[in-house]
From Swiss-Prot:
Superkingdom to which the source organism belongs: Bacteria
Name of the protein: 2-C-methyl-D-erythritol 2,4-cyclodiphosphate synthase
CDD domains: MECDP_synthase
Gene expressing this chain: ispF
Subunit structure: Homotrimer.
Listed cofactors: a divalent metal cation
Source lineage: Bacteria, Pseudomonadati, Pseudomonadota, Alphaproteobacteria, Rickettsiales
Length: 184
């Protein structure tokens, strides 16, 4: 017989996001991944800034605390979110988690694409995310893989990300220290 547990000390969430590339270049010459601007010759098709890494983290964090998905909270049909920085969505998701008494313990993020090359930007991404979420960088793992030229990603038509977030129950529902947006 399965018994109900009132307060689960740890919770796990899984997130996924995918966006296609447009044939046109981005207006400012870069795309944004995990809050970091990366020079790239193609624009990401998206309603917001198209940051697939951050979108996957938002989805994982919302799922972790039973708050649905990024599309429920920030629908791409709502003009308020047009060109919005995805860091706003992540801070909102973190706020919802903290309001329920959960803090992010660690996360693992995989970005899937052929181009742009992600590995050179990972240290900057980890630093940005650690400052944004008020976490130690050692609790953050960001990596990149390709699809070995298979499928739409392999043909260079898009980019995807998978995220796993582990949260722990905390005694006080207060913001993590340093959880201001480092982009200003």
């Amino acid at each position: 017989m399965i018994t109900a547990v009132r307060a689960v000390p740890f919770r796990v969430g899984i997130g996924y996001d995918v966006h296609g590339f447009a044939d046109s270049p981005p207006e400012n010459g870069h795309i944004v991944l995990c809050g970091v601007e990366i020079a790239f010759h193609r624009k990401i098709k998206a309603h917001s800034d198209g940051d697939v890494g951050t979108h996957a983290l938002v989805d994982a964090l919302l799922g972790c605390v039973g708050e649905g998905s990024i599309g429920e909270h920030f629908p791409n049909t709502d003009p308020r979110w047009e060109n919005m920085s995805s860091t706003h969505f992540l801070l909102e998701a973190q706020s919802k988690a903290l309001a329920k008494g959960y803090a992010v313990l660690n996360f693992d993020l995989t970005i899937v694409c052929e181009l742009p090359k992600i590995i050179p930007h990972v240290p900057k991404m980890k630093l940005f995310m650690s400052k944004l979420l008020g976490m130690d960088a050692s609790a953050i793992n960001i990596k990149a893989v390709t699809t070995e030229k298979l499928g739409f990603i392999g043909r260079g038509e898009g980019i995807a990300a998978h995220a796993v977030v582990l949260c722990r129950k905390v005694t006080a529902a207060a913001p993590n220290p340093g959880s201001e947006n480092p982009r200003g």
